Amino acid sequence: MRTGLGYDLHRLVRGKKLMMGGVHIPFKKGEKAHSDGDVLLHAITDALLGACGMGDIGEFFPPSDKKWKDANSSELLSTVWERISEAGWKIQNIDCVIIIEEPKILPFREEIRKSIAGILKIEKEQIFIKAKTGEGIGIIGRGKAVAALASCLIFCRHTQE
């Protein structure tokens, strides 16, 4: 068994969509990023890559490569997970924290869990999501950014049989 930890942060700006776990969250601002800016999927991707010792999201999808401009983060995670699972890894669970001042994430939590489960082809009961605010402190607390943390526990299916 191995654990991985992922983190991502993006500024929030007007005129962009707010994407969270592959779900569009209606809001006046969205993530400013090279891809679609889905901080939650980016954090999960980094957690999985770290657990497998396969680097990080920037190595797989460098922002300097125009091919990844406005890329769908669901597709990025799916691509990475396909490679990891081909190497024999399975997910035990993924635990996430979204840090955002507004909007409230709770009304979207189950849809986000379903979306992530669909991307990774696992049960939504293996995915846990919590949301916190910045308590008015710092760039997140002022509503100018969003961040996400994700941890994962994976195991090699060859050692479980």
UniProtKB/Swiss-Prot annotation:
Cofactor(s) essential for the protein: a divalent metal cation
A single BP term in Gene Ontology: terpenoid biosynthetic process
Keywords for this protein: Isoprene biosynthesis, Lyase, Metal-binding
Site (Transition state stabilizer): H34, T133
Oxidoreductase is among the record's keywords: no
InterPro entries given in the database record: MECDP_synthase (IPR003526), MECDP_synthase_CS (IPR020555), MECDP_synthase_sf (IPR036571)
Annotated binding of a divalent metal cation, by residue: D8, H10, H42
Sites where the protein binds 4-CDP-2-C-methyl-D-erythritol 2-phosphate: D8, L9, H10, H34, S35, D56, I57, G58, R142
Cofactor note: Binds 1 divalent metal cation per subunit.
SUPFAM superfamilies cross-referenced by the UniProt entry: IpsF-like
Pathway: Isoprenoid biosynthesis; isopentenyl diphosphate biosynthesis via DXP pathway; isopentenyl diphosphate from 1-deoxy-D-xylulose 5-phosphate: step 4/6
Family recorded in the similarity comment: Belongs to the IspF family.
Listed name of the protein: 2-C-methyl-D-erythritol 2,4-cyclodiphosphate synthase
